[in-house]
């Protein structure tokens, strides 16, 4: 019996966006300059704290997901960084207008322009964590590799409502994945993988020129940035994978990887699926963790603990209902000699914001 690997988003999106840049052939400009060492590993901390960074070179860091060796928002480290509760902080990725990446438009859009039925959420409505990315530059101007860590302040019940009941019912921890990547790689109109972008604008211009459309949702069928496929539309990202429950979190993966939009028709939804790729171009060529524990075994009965890719699935055609329809039917077929999908609930944060 063959089994595919899927993590299912555990919660309905509040409203979100992302942006895309870089491609799979991006050259590594980093050297062997001493990497930045963080005084605390990513995870959950009951109270705010001061984070120390150390390296042989001058340290620069960012808090917006961008690469500090390339970003114009990088800050030169000159002392401890305060890591505190971010409740109520201004949204960034969640502030992007859903109109830019969703085609669930009002049926009156024909006369009034494209108007999404969903508004971006308020600052208070989006749970947040802190993501610090840091790199060091030596006297010759050479950069180290970028180090990234994700921090949650307070208890996990403060961040994820119902996590205690969820873990008790499932008998296991909840998967929480923090995705960090450049904003433009998600939302830029030319290279952003999450938005409709230039590809959609060109298709839409031809579409309205035909003057035969009946309702705004017809635009879901149009080509867009998010519907593009292949390595050209893969972007570089970083993931922090935590196994979480009401008592704390274990960081089981801290890894750079590739990311693409996943799905077919659901690519035009507000909450889109992601496919993650481990490649030597980004570091390790495998995700080395038994994500599904003893549930997933090879033909010899050994637990599978290395993966080249896995999917963060937002629900597909069931995204607006239970989200778990496919997962349920797959479990019923698990004992049959055919291909099935292993899955488990997962909560996703994007550049420090609940997605």
Language model feature labels by segment:
Residues 17-20:
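C-terminal motif of bacterial Sec signal peptides marking the signal peptidase cleavage site
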Residues 24-228, 234-236, 241-245, 252-255:
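Short, compositionally stereotyped local motifs that mark structural "simplifiers"
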Residues 4, 22-25:
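Generic cytosolic/nucleocytoplasmic N-terminal low-complexity/intrinsically disordered segments
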Residues 179, 212-355:
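Conserved ATP-binding subdomain of kinase catalytic cores across diverse folds
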């Amino acid at each position: 019996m063959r089994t595919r690997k899927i993590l299912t988003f555990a919660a309905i999106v509040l409203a979100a966006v992302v942006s895309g840049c870089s491609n799979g052939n991006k050259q590594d400009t980093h050297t062997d300059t001493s990497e930045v060492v963080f005084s605390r590993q990513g995870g959950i901390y009951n109270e705010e704290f001061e984070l120390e960074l150390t390296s042989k070179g001058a340290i620069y860091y960012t808090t917006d997901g961008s690469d500090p060796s390339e970003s114009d928002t990088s800050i030169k480290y000159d002392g401890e960084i305060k890591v505190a509760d971010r409740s109520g902080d201004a949204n960034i990725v969640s502030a992007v207008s859903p109109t830019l990446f969703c085609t669930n438009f009002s049926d009156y859009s024909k006369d009034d322009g494209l108007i999404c039925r969903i508004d971006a959420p308020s600052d208070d409505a989006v749970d947040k964590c802190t993501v610090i990315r840091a790199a060091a530059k030596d006297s010759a101007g050479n950069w180290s590799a970028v180090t990234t860590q994700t921090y949650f302040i307070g208890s996990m019940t403060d961040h994820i409502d119902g996590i205690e009941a969820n873990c008790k019912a499932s008998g296991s921890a909840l998967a929480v994945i923090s995705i960090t990547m450049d904003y433009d790689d998600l939302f830029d109109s030319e290279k952003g993988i999450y938005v409709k972008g230039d590809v959609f604008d060109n298709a839409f211009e031809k579409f309205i020129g035909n003057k035969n459309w009946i309702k705004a949702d017809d635009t879901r069928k149009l080509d867009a940035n998010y519907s593009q496929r292949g390595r050209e539309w893969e972007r570089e990202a970083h993931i922090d994978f935590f196994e979480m429950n009401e008592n704390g979190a274990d960081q089981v993966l801290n890894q750079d990887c590739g990311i693409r939009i996943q799905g077919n028709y659901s690519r035009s939804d507000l909450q889109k699926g992601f496919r993650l790729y481990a490649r030597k171009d980004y570091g390790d060529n495998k995700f080395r963790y038994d994500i599904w524990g003893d549930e997933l075994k090879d033909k010899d009965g050994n637990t599978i603990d290395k993966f080249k890719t896995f999917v963060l699935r937002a629900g597909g055609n069931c995204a607006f209902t239970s989200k778990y329809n496919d997962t349920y039917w797959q479990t019923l077929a698990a004992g049959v000699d055919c291909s099935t999908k292993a899955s488990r609930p997962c909560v996703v944060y994007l550049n420090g914001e609940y997605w």
